[in-house]
Structure formats: C-alpha cells, structure tokens
Design a protein with these regions (language model features):
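Glycine-rich loop-to-alpha-helix module at the N-terminal edge of alpha/beta enzyme cores
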Residues: 1-54
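Short acidic, glycine/serine/threonine-rich loops at helix termini
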Residues: 42-45, 67-72, 136-137, 165-170
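Active-site nucleophile and cofactor-binding loops and adjacent substrate-binding regions
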Residues: 6-13, 31-37, 60-63, 161, ...
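Active-site PLP attachment segment
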Residues: 173-192
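N-terminal glycine-rich dinucleotide-binding loop that anchors FAD/FMN and/or NAD(P) in oxidoreductases
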Residues: 72-103
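Active-site core of PLP-dependent enzymes with the aminotransferase class I/II
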Residues: 107-114, 127-154
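Buried hydrophobic positions in well-ordered alpha/beta secondary-structure cores of metabolic enzymes
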Residues: 20, 43, 56, 100, ...
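Conserved PLP-anchoring active-site segment centered on the Schiff-base-forming lysine
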Residues: 49-64, 70
C-alpha cells in the first residue's frame, strides 16, 4: 500500500487523477506518465489512434520533448511563411519528417493553408499555448480551435510548462480555449 506500484493504481494516484480532472478544463480522464515528453508522445499517439490519421502539425520553435516528433523544428528552418520539419538530433528516421508539418507560431493563415492541403491526413495540431515567452496573438488559440473542429483534427495543448503556472486550469483557463487533449508535466510532478 505504501510502496512502489508498477501495474495497479494506488488510492493516492486515483485521488490525484480526480483532482486533475476537477482542475483541468478539458480533462475527462488521466493517463500518468513519468515525463512531459512521454505525456506529449502519448497525446500524439492517442490522436492518431482516435482519428486514424498519421500526420501532425506543430509550430516552429516549439519543443515537445525528446521523442522523435517533439524535437523537430525547435530552431528555424525553411522559409518564414512555410517552415519545414528539421531534426534537432541525429537518429530521427526520415519517415518522421514526412509525418510532421510545421507552421509559424501565431500565423493562422499558414495553418489554414496547411490544413487545406493536408487536412484529411492530419490527426492533431499540437501547440504550446504560451511558447515560452511568446504569447499567443489575440484570436490565435481560438482560431486553432475553430480550424480543428471544422476539419475533425484534434487540438492538443502542451501544458508541460504552462500547466498550473498561468492559472489552476493552466492556459486553457487563462485563454478560454479548451483543447481535445492536454499534456502536463513539471509542476504537476513536483518538478521545475
């Protein structure tokens, strides 16, 4: 009861999950992970499973963890209006580059162009609602919500950094936009 658990949830984990569902606007269920990278990776995998689609859209400069999809295009590559996926580490399979599309942060017109071209293949758009120190432009997050709803694409908020820091309900509460999925880490686990 008070030791390590490898398969079964403890009462404390269930209580924490219930508190998270109460605090996080989009939360209906909780999957615990050991790291924020695992949380974002699980969210992407769930989006692919739910939609039956392969591709994801992320934003240039966003870091979603050290998994193959999270560490693409953390720095600028390609043109300003159409960045291209670029690995930030050796060992990322070229197939991953075919499954990830990249848009400039705060550019809804670019997102619309990409969705128009690839919408039927897009499982999810993953976004850090507050990209470290770059705030979302007015209407950007709600615009993403509208685009994803119109095209059957899941919207994922990477709240590993923003969760419980901007407000108890994270960026979802602060900006009034509710995604389909959210990934939390750092503060939720007692980290920095």
């Amino acid at each position: 009861r008070d030791g390590s658990a490898f398969a079964m949830l403890t009462e404390a984990a269930i209580e924490l999950a219930e508190a998270l569902v109460e605090a996080i606007p989009c939360a209906e269920q909780v999957l615990f992970a050991a790291t924020g990278a695992e949380a974002t990776h699980f969210a992407l995998r769930l989006a692919r499973a739910a939609t039956g689609r392969e591709k994801i859209l992320k934003f240039e400069g966003a870091y979603h963890g050290h998994h193959d999809y999270g560490i693409l295009s953390v720095t600028s590559r390609g043109t300003a209006d159409l960045p291209r996926p670029a690995p930030e580490s050796a060992g990322i399979p070229s197939r991953v580059l075919d499954e990830v599309l990249v848009a400039p942060f705060n550019d809804l017109a670019a997102v619309e162009r990409i969705v128009k071209q690839h919408g039927g293949d897009l499982a999810a758009i993953i976004v850090e609602p507050l990209q470290r120190i770059v705030e979302p432009a007015p209407g950007f997050l709600s615009g993403l919500r509208d685009i994803t709803r119109r095209h059957g694409i899941l919207l994922i908020f990477d709240e590993v950094v923003t969760g419980f820091r901007l407000a108890l309900g994270g960026a979802q509460e602060t900006y009034g936009v509710i995604p389909d999925l959210a990934a939390y880490g750092k503060v939720v686990g007692g980290g920095y």
